[in-house]
């Protein structure tokens, strides 16, 4: 891994998303590493939260394990049972980042804040829409400036798809406070 990263955690909002991840030979396309992980570390499978939290904790303790895939909920529950320092030298990628909020009662936002303030973890924030649907900010301005924004328009993104059969794009307009 680069930049002294020893572990990667990918957190997705739903099991269906994470369970669709497959091993991929990225090195064939010029990347320095393949997407290759221990399938036991894909926690986006049916089963109870306690078992998944235990597996998450075991992953963090095992120096030879490097990639874990879990839901936002598993990340939140496991975070409650771990010392924040175990996330040092870890890349935490949060898919559907607009689920985060700077509001005090947003648990995913609290986890993110602790990672940013108390560790050297790298954060990758991924979302197709930075819009939450309410008036709460995803991040406070002091935190947002810490991120490097990478934006692709639909045409740039679609050029990367090889097997896309169809795509539907909808627009929704809101009035008043949302």
Give the predicted meaning of each segment.
Residues 1:
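Walker A/P-loop
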Residues 4-36, 74:
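Conserved Walker A/P-loop ATP-binding site and its immediately adjacent core
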Residues 12, 94, 127:
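Short beta-strand/turn micro-motifs composed of small residues
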Residues 15-18, 73-76, 98-99, 128-133:
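Conserved nucleotide-binding/hydrolysis micro-motifs of P-loop NTPases
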Residues 20-28, 92, 107-114, 138-139:
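Alpha-helical scaffold elements adjacent to nucleotide-binding pockets in ATP/GTP-utilizing enzyme cores
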Residues 30-77:
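Inter-Walker segment of RecA-like/P-loop motor cores
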Residues 72-74, 83-124:
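SF2 helicase catalytic motif II
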């Amino acid at each position: 891994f680069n930049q002294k990263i020893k572990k990667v955690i990918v957190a997705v909002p739903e099991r269906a998303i994470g369970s669709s991840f497959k091993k991929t030979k990225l090195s064939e396309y010029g990347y320095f590493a393949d997407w290759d992980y221990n399938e036991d570390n894909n926690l986006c499978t049916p089963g109870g939260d306690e078992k998944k939290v235990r597996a998450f904790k075991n992953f963090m303790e095992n120096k030879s394990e490097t990639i874990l895939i879990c839901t936002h909920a598993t990340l939140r529950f496991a975070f409650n049972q771990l010392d924040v320092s175990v996330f040092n030298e870890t890349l935490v990628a949060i898919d559907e980042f607009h689920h985060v909020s700077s509001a005090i009662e947003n648990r995913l936002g609290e986890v993110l804040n602790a990672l940013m303030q108390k560790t050297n973890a790298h954060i990758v924030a991924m979302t197709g829409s930075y819009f939450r649907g309410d008036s709460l900010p995803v991040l406070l301005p002091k935190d947002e400036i810490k991120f490097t924004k990478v934006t692709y328009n639909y045409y740039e993104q679609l050029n990367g798809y090889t097997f896309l059969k169809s795509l539907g794009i909808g627009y929704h307009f809101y009035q008043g406070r949302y």
